[in-house]
């Protein structure tokens, strides 16, 4: 059984805080839960005090990933596993614990160069979350904020690291050629969500995309309309994946990496699950939108 329970939070470094706040609240439907003097802010979507930490930073990329474990004993065990695997582990400072609003955390860098934090005891919100634009709810809470797809220099080494050190379980692979690109992505899970982590090849940024799941199909369509109305660059139109069965679309965040907004994701029962390999990214849809040609 994985020692990690869920994808807890993402730390993002962004160059345009104002654009990110509008995007996160108006397009995605998240809520601002905290602001700092330097302009940084936190975003919530469920019972947790926050799921995203957004900092002023020209990086425009992922700064760190936070994975939740059950308690102090699990954090100590995870740290010991990392050290046995030859990975340097450092304890989070009091300032970092306060910023993340967690009881304790440790930090390390994974084989792909991604800064990772393990934590326990997240602060919970005092009031239920109600989105201003999402009519149903975000499928999060005990399944975590959603999923993320990371860039890796050595996909297999990263896959083995997460599976052997933390007990991540293999969901499946997608291997295919599309649009002149070779796609080879590994999907892994830590709870019943089909995947909380997917690993691809080298990409311009650390993160390819994060995914948020909602409780009603119409909320995906409404988010698609909001994104288009706000001038958000749509990367892939509405479609459905064959592996996790997610009905979704992809578009750009203000930082250039992507997000996926979906509904209907498959849940895994480890007692019966058999990993497989798919040879298409989508069963239907997820097409690149036509680009307007300049007038001559």
Please provide the spans of the model-predicted regions.
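Short, charged/polar, Gly/Pro-enriched secondary-structure boundary elements
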Residues: 48-53, 113-116, 194-197, 257-258
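Vicinal oxygen chelate
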Residues: 6-15, 57-153, 184-188, 231-296, ...
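N-terminal beta-strand motif that seeds the catalytic metal site of vicinal oxygen chelate
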Residues: 1-18, 62-67, 123-156, 169-171, ...
